[in-house]
């Protein structure tokens, strides 16, 4: 994670080398990319530094030859900030709200 959130969990940036090594040593896992969910901002432009940092991290891991497929996917960007994510190199988007509409609230 590139930031701490009480509502989200995941790997933190400092743990990435250890995680990459564990995946490399596994016979059943292959690292194919990185994903981030930045904080929600009314101004999507504020998500840019998070996307840019993940792109930088991906490029470094790719230079090291650590991605199983060699590419290193970047899963980042949702309905409200996907344009910024694309500009910062996203290869996978999560745009369910744009396709299916808002979720019903329980």
How should each PLM-predicted stretch be described?
Residues 1-80, 86-88, 100:
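Conserved alpha/beta-domain cores
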Residues 86-106:
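C-terminal helical cap(s) of enzyme catalytic domains, especially alpha/beta-barrels
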């Amino acid at each position: 994670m590139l930031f701490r959130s009480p509502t989200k969990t995941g790997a933190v940036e400092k743990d990435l080398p250890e995680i990459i090594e564990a995946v490399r040593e596994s016979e059943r896992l292959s690292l194919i990319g990185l994903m981030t969910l930045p904080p929600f901002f009314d101004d999507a432009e504020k998500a840019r530094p998070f996307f840019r940092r993940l792109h930088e991290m991906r490029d470094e891991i790719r230079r090291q030859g650590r991605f199983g497929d060699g590419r290193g996917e970047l899963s980042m960007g949702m309905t409200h900030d996907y344009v910024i994510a694309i500009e910062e190199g996203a290869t996978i988007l999560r745009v369910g709200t744009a396709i299916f509409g808002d979720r019903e609230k329980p």
